[in-house]
């Protein structure tokens, strides 16, 4: 169906999950000029509230557009061979130390042009959109040179121009140590701080800076240098932390006011407390946990106890989470991590937006941008309960119905 365009439209008699909770009765929602202009219980709605509005949808479940707050969507090649290796008992760390893992994707991505990366990435982006995504973060991290990291960020920005979706970009220069810097990690960190971050900031290509704080990545001291450089250039901070061990990376990120700490399977109470005090979001990545067949669960009860917001993301990447289906992540977050369906759905909407520093997104509230999904289901929990394609009836971006069936 072709894209529809009108400045004023209604969704009537819909069950609403507003990004935090399911509203208690059927609602009518008015969108005008790209924003949510009204929200009424259906039984109280009066036509005078919305004169001239076209009815865009009736019935079903209306949620905020999904926000995928952690992806590595831009890359070339694949790592299916490593998937087989892991099934044969070779660990992720062993593969990485042997020159595979992230560095395998680095070789392929360095060799690809921007246009080739666009062609490789568009099908993955389209899969996310078909599952209800209206905003996503895309990280670099498979270039590991100034030129190649900027190339990846430019591709990410172009993807947001080629499709009706909001793309937030994150510079992940400290994803792995490139082979040409073997044994010289501090020198590479200097490159990230002195050249990569300034170049990305000068071109307006990055909204945030991320690091991989891990034994096979970068030390807390090295990550701290990168945080200081990011702050000096006005960029937000994020962290891959406590995925394989506890180096205190989440607490370090929190001290620098990080938007989020991601993975966090080995996070301890001190780290949880630091995140709570800083308002840092815990981004759960059940896809990587599932694919790597991990057993160390993130400390969900501690996160609840301290009131740390929990987001859920796909971590779409070629090695450890080659999955472009956020609703599957909701199911995995519930079945593997014991989130409630409400927590999982909030984690893919309001809390995911918080992890990107976009408190205006991921909500159905008067004044919020009208990024919406209308689903052919009876209650919001079904998005986490059942793993199933084809439930999306409409995807609305900035008030425009950009997909309908």
From Swiss-Prot:
Swiss-Prot/TrEMBL cofactor(s): Zn(2+); Fe(3+)
Example of a GO MF term: imidazolonepropionase activity
Disulfide cross-links: none
Positions that bind 4-imidazolone-5-propanoate: 79, 142, 175, 243, 320
CC annotations in GO: cytoplasm
Details of cofactor binding: Binds 1 zinc or iron ion per subunit.
Protein keywords: Cytoplasm, Histidine metabolism, Hydrolase, Iron, Metal-binding, Zinc
Residues engaged in binding Zn(2+): 70, 72, 240, 315
Binding site for N-formimidoyl-L-glutamate: 142, 317, 319
Presence of keyword Disulfide bond: no
Transmembrane segments: none
GO biological process terms, semicolon-separated: L-histidine catabolic process to glutamate and formamide; L-histidine catabolic process to glutamate and formate
Positions contributing to Fe(3+) binding: 70, 72, 240, 315
Pfam annotation, one family: Amidohydro_1
Reaction(s) this enzyme catalyzes, per UniProt: 4-imidazolone-5-propanoate + H2O = N-formimidoyl-L-glutamate
CDD domains: Imidazolone-5PH
NCBIfam families, A to Z: hutI (TIGR01224)
Full protein name: Imidazolonepropionase
Species this chain originates from: Ectopseudomonas mendocina (strain ymp) (Pseudomonas mendocina)
Gene of this entry: hutI
């Amino acid at each position: 169906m072709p894209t529809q365009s009108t400045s004023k439209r209604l969704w009537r008699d819909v069950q609403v999950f507003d990004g935090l909770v399911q509203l208690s009765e059927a609602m009518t929602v008015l969108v005008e000029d790209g924003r949510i202009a009204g929200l009424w219980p259906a039984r109280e709605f009066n036509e005078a509230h919305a004169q001239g509005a076209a009815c865009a949808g009736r019935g079903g479940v209306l949620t905020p557009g999904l926000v995928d707050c952690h992806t590595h969507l831009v890359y070339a090649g694949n790592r299916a061979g490593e998937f087989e290796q892991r099934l044969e008992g070779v660990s992720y760390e062993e593969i990485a130390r042997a020159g595979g893992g992230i560095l395998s994707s680095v070789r392929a991505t360095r060799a690809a042009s921007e246009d080739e990366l666009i062609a490789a990435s568009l099908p993955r982006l389209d899969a996310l959109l078909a599952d209800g995504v209206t905003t996503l973060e895309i990280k670099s991290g498979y270039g590991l040179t100034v030129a190649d990291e900027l190339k990846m960020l430019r591709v990410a920005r172009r993807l947001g121009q080629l499709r009706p979706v909001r793309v937030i970009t994150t510079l992940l220069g400290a994803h792995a140590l490139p082979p040409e810097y073997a044994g010289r990690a501090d020198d590479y960190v200097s490159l990230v701080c002195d050249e990569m971050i300034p170049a990305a900031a000068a071109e307006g290509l990055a909204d945030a800076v991320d690091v991989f704080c891990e034994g096979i990545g970068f030390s807390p001291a090295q990550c701290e240098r990168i945080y200081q450089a990011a702050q000096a250039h006005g960029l937000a901070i994020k962290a891959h932390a406590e995925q394989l061990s506890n180096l205190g990376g989440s607490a370090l990120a929190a001290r620098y006011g990080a938007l989020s700490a991601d993975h966090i399977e080995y996070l301890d109470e001190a780290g949880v407390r630091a995140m709570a005090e800083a308002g840092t979001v815990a981004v759960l990545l059940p896809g990587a946990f599932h694919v790597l067949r991990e057993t160390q669960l993130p400390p969900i009860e501690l996160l609840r106890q301290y009131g740390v917001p929990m987001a859920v993301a796909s971590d779409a990447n070629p090695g450890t989470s080659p999955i472009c289906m956020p609703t599957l992540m909701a199911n995995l977050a519930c079945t593997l991590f014991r989130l409630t369906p409400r927590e999982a759905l909030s984690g893919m909407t309001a809390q995911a937006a918080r992890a990107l520093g976009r408190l205006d997104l991921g909500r159905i509230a008067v004044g919020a941008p009208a990024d919406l999904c209308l689903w052919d289901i009876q209650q919001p929990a079904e998005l986490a309960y059942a793993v199933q394609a084809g439930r999306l009836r409409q995807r609305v971006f900035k008030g425009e119905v950009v997909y309908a069936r």
